[in-house]
């Protein structure tokens, strides 16, 4: 979407969510249009392989091919942005860590919208928040992520990216609703980054729900304006 064919154009690689088995929803395509306007960016959203027919390995191979190709089309990796929501947020952060291991350039920014950060779902606080979350349940999510993991342990960074090497990644922006199952892990993750001295932006969606920026509510526009300040004008 919005490809000007220019090497200095900001480029977003968007990794959509969907519990590792769903293709993008209409909300995703609407959100891409908003990202184009807010960031004046070219946006690419691959429909990656999913469970039950594939696991994470096939998707990481696809994303690596796409990312390497993007690196040849832009002047500066700083102009690359990886965004992921929900399961896509998990994939986005894990993929950035894999890029580091493969000694490939980091994107300028990594934006995580209600990401799955710990696939073991062992945080006891998560059960309390689950009672208020109409969208995401722990037991069902754990069953699906086990299929996605294949033979990888659930505590491996590719499944639980908060367990990985977080140094030297692109600038992380994290948003999550305070009324969702994943909120406690997001808070824990932000504290971890602070403890490591890693600059990042943590934007809680107060009294909001899972992947709230994908829905037509006022807070969506507010988050887009914050993203623009972080990525485009660099005011935050």
What are the roles of these predicted feature ranges?
Residues 1-2:
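A short loop-to-beta-strand scaffold at the N-terminal edge of the catalytic core in hydrolase folds
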Residues 5-236:
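Alpha/beta-hydrolase superfamily serine-hydrolase fold, recognizing
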């Amino acid at each position: 979407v919005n490809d000007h064919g220019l090497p200095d154009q900001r480029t977003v690689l968007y990794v959509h969510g969907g519990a590792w088995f769903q293709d993008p929803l209409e909300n995703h395509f609407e959100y891409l249009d908003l990202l184009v306007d807010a960031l004046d960016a070219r946006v690419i959203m691959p429909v990656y392989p999913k469970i039950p027919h594939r696991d994470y390995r096939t998707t990481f191979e696809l994303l690596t091919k796409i990312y390497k190709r993007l690196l040849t089309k832009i002047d500066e990796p700083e102009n690359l942005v990886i965004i992921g929501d929900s399961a896509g947020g998990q994939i986005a952060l894990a993929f950035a860590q894999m890029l580091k291991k493969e000694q490939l350039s980091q994107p300028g920014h990594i934006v995580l919208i209600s990401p799955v950060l710990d696939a073991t779902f062992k945080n006891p606080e998560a059960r309390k928040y689950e009672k208020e979350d109409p969208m995401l349940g722990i037991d069902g999510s754990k069953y699906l992520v086990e299929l996605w993991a294949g033979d990888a342990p659930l505590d491996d960074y590719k499944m639980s990216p908060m367990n990985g090497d977080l140094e030297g990644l692109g600038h992380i922006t994290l948003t999550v609703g305070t009324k969702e199952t994943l909120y406690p892990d997001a808070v824990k993750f932000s504290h971890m980054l602070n403890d490591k001295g890693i600059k990042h932006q943590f934007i809680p969606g107060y009294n909001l729900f899972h992947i709230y920026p994908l829905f037509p509510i006022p807070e969506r526009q507010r988050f887009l304006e914050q993203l623009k300040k972080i990525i485009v004008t660099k005011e935050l």
